[in-house]
């Protein structure tokens, strides 16, 4: 057998070869933001270099994979604005792009690895492996597979099979160090004692991820593998396997690897897909803009410039180079994510903003009757709302006072604003508002300011009871513009209702 670690087995990529990258998630559960960050960096790299973005589905885990998760994954990627050059719904020269439909390919490659001496059958039972592993640990030695079945004779194999043992297939790792240059982390070397032979096919004949992932990359001619740091330790295994596949004529080259930094959650722990803030669906349901979320995720390991956090996806694509990715862990900061999304909301054309808010202006989010929604009022209030929101879902609570017959009082807001003397202030404010010019927010402001002065209050203190009386909350859109849009009759009626509640 040829040495799978020999330099001649690694064919370098030719100059000017357009990169081919892949994104290959498993359809299990809800998509998470770490997965999106990986997709984003691969997609941006492909678009920046004029390369090919391959979307592949790793659906060989029948117990965990589901068609529902698969459809949700496709929908999420489309919502984010990702397009792919090859993959589900698009096709391509290396179809099919679902691993569950490629099983015969993997079995064929596994047999070629066996025939070429790059792999072998292992008959060790789980109990035997555990016993030898424990003994190695006790002796202070590496606890990986010890090569027990590496050189079995035909007689030994026959004896094991006579016992009813069904073997797995293990890949034979070279007895030399494996070095590769990581695009993010530089040169990395693994010693042979730390990378033992590993399983590639289960005893039932099912190929493992350790085989199918590199085989698909080889057959699809992937040139760059950009993935999470958690997969770094598997890279020497895959490099050795690629070299074997090259010698078998299956692969053309070993791809370049770039391992992206961990995304950290709270408490200095890696953000897990089980963490509530990791779920992509959460951000979509809250009304994050795709461009705002992607802008923030791009900052988890990369930056456009030291003094600029807000940019478009086109600007990111124009500047993105995987070699600029920072290898240090990146912390997910929800408040910063919201702030960046708020900036992107403000960058929208007003008409675009009004349309993107539509889902939150009707059931199940809106708490008003459909017939009470007033399109004309919505069009007028929208620009004021646009400058205040962090996420689109906040629009409902900010404008409900316009469409409800009467405000829904937030109890905390009522307690905070309606202090002793608020009834007298509201009576004075009502008188002055009734006499004000209702075509001018400035006139309404002057009315409340004058009412406050009569009671020894500055505008901020004077307007708080008025705001709660009319909108039900202490915080909201610009008050006097809101009063003008609501109208004189409804505003005064709500002040009267608040006075009745105060004096009840």
UniProtKB/Swiss-Prot annotation:
Provenance organism: Streptomyces avermitilis (strain ATCC 31267 / DSM 46492 / JCM 5070 / NBRC 14893 / NCIMB 12804 / NRRL 8165 / MA-4680)
Location of the protein in the cell: Cytoplasm
Assembly and oligomerization: Monomer.
GO function terms (MF aspect): ATP binding; glutamate-tRNA ligase activity; tRNA binding; zinc ion binding
GO cellular component, one term: cytosol
UniProt-recorded name of the protein: Glutamate--tRNA ligase
The record's free-text note on cofactor binding: Binds 1 zinc ion per subunit.
GO biological process: glutamyl-tRNA aminoacylation
Cofactor: Zn(2+)
Record gene name: gltX
Alphabetized Pfam families for the sequence: Anticodon_2, tRNA-synt_1c
Disulfide partners: none
Binding site residues for ATP: 273
EC number assigned by the record: 6.1.1.17
Gene3D superfamilies tied to this protein: 1.10.10.350, Glutamate-tRNA synthetase, class I, anticodon-binding domain 1, HUPs
Motif 'HIGH' region, chain ranges: 25-35
Record carries keyword Lyase: no
Enzyme class: ligase
Catalytic reactions on record: tRNA(Glu) + L-glutamate + ATP = L-glutamyl-tRNA(Glu) + AMP + diphosphate
Binding site for Zn(2+): 122, 124, 149, 151
Protein purpose: Catalyzes the attachment of glutamate to tRNA(Glu) in a two-step reaction: glutamate is first activated by ATP to form Glu-AMP and then transferred to the acceptor end of tRNA(Glu).
Sequence motif 'KMSKS' region, residues: 270-274
Record keywords, A-Z: Aminoacyl-tRNA synthetase, ATP-binding, Cytoplasm, Ligase, Metal-binding, Nucleotide-binding, Protein biosynthesis, Zinc
Family per record: Belongs to the class-I aminoacyl-tRNA synthetase family. Glutamate--tRNA ligase type 1 subfamily.
């Amino acid at each position: 057998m040829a040495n799978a670690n020999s330099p001649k087995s690694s064919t370098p990529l030719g100059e000017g070869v357009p990169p081919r990258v892949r994104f290959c998630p498993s359809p299990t559960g809800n998509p998470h933001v770490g997965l999106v960050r990986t997709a984003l960096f691969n997609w941006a790299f492909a678009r920046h270099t004029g390369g090919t973005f391959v979307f592949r589905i790793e659906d060989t885990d029948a117990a965990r994979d589901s068609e529902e998760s698969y459809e949700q994954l496709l929908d999420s990627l489309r919502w984010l604005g990702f397009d792919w050059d090859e993959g589900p719904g698009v096709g391509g020269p290396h179809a099919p792009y679902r691993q569950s439909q490629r099983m015969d390919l993997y079995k064929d490659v596994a047999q070629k690895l066996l025939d070429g001496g790059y792999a072998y059958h292992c008959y060790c039972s789980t109990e035997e492996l555990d016993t030898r592993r424990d003994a190695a640990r006790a002796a202070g030695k590496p606890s990986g597979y010890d090569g027990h079945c590496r050189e079995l004779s035909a007689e030994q194999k026959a004896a094991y099979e006579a016992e009813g043992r069904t073997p797995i297939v293990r890949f034979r790792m070279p007895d030399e160090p494996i070095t590769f240059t990581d695009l993010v982390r530089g040169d990395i070397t693994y010693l042979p004692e730390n990378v033992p032979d590993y399983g590639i096919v289960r005893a039932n004949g099912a190929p493992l991820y350790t085989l199918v992932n590199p085989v698909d990359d080889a057959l699809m001619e992937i040139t760059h593998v950009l993935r999470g740091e958690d997969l770094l330790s598997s890279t020497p295994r895959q490099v050795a396997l690629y070299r074997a596949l090259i010698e078998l004529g299956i692969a053309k080259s070993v791809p370049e690897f770039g391992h992206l930094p961990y995304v950290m959650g709270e408490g200095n722990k890696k953000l897990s897909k089980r963490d509530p803030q990791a779920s992509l669906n959460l951000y979509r349901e809250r009304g994050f803009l795709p461009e705002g979320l992607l802008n923030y995720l791009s900052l988890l390991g990369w930056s456009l410039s030291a003094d600029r956090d807000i940019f478009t996806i086109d600007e990111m694509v124009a500047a993105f180079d995987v070699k600029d990715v920072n290898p240090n862990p990146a912390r997910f900061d929800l408040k910063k994510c919201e702030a960046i999304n708020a900036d992107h909301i403000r960058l929208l054309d007003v008409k675009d903003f009004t349309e993107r808010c539509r889902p939150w202006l009707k059931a199940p989010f809106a708490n008003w009757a459909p017939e009470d929604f007033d399109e004309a009022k919505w069009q007028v209030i929208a620009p004021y709302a646009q400058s205040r929101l962090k996420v689109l879902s906040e629009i409902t609570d900010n404008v409900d006072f316009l469409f409800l017959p009467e405000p829904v009082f937030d109890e905390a807001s009522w307690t905070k604003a309606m202090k002793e003397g608020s009834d007298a202030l509201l009576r004075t404010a009502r008188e002055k508002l009734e006499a004000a010019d209702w075509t001018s927010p400035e006139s309404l402001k002057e009315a409340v300011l004058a009412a406050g002065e009569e009671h020894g209050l500055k505008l901020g203190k004077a307007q708080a009871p008025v705001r709660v009386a009319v909108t039900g909350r202490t915080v909201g859109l610009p008050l006097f513009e809101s009063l003008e849009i609501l109208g004189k009759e409804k505003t005064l009626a709500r002040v009267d209702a608040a006075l009745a509640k105060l004096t009840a």
